[in-house]
Every structure is written in structure tokens, then in C-alpha cells.
Amino acid sequence: MINEELYKDLMALLVRVSNLRNTPQISKDTDVEYLKKDIVSVMTIVLRASREKAGTEDFSLGVDYSEALEYMDRCRIWISLLLETKAISKHIHFQLSRMADSIYCRLSDSSVQKTTLI
């Protein structure tokens, strides 16, 4: 199921971002916390979609993938800001951006599939 894969990839991104705290350039008051919150918001939406597909939640609530896309777009912006402020290296930026872009593309595909089913 695509939602399980998305959730795992989001978890991997969250872990990778959380591990940034171990670098000396990252302080507690940086954009990392905002980035983590946005990732968790996307995870919540993907989890809700999985539950609806499994029938454990009311399908009439619907899943708003556009909201998830907005959060992922913000994640991509936070990642770029971390590079601009030199909080992360270009190498780490590339890795995080690649992960975020992959998730964004799959969410975008899910959004298209969802709207065509309705």
C-alpha cells in the first residue's frame, strides 16, 4: 500500500532531521523544530488515509492530500533555509531535499488519484 511506504519514508526523514541535533551548527532555536512539526503533520494525514482505506475510520471524512502537499512544500522550504543559514552542508541538504521531493511527488500522485475517484 502506498500509504505505508509514504509513512515509512516520512519516518526516515523525521529521524534524519532529528539526528541533525547532534551537529554543532544546529541549536535548539533553529528551523529544525518547525521542520519536524511539519513532517509530523504530513505523517498524521498519511496515517489517517491508511486508516480510512482499512475501514477503521469513517471514509466520509475524506483525506485532504492538498494539506499534506502544503506541509511538504513547507518542509522543502525549511530544508533550503537550513542550507542558506549554513546550518547544514550541501551534502545533507541534497539528501534531505531528495527525500522530501520523493515524498512530495508521491503525495501529489495520491492527491490526483483521490480526486479522480470522487
Each model region followed by its residue ranges:
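Amphipathic alpha-helical assembly/interaction segments
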Residues: 1-118
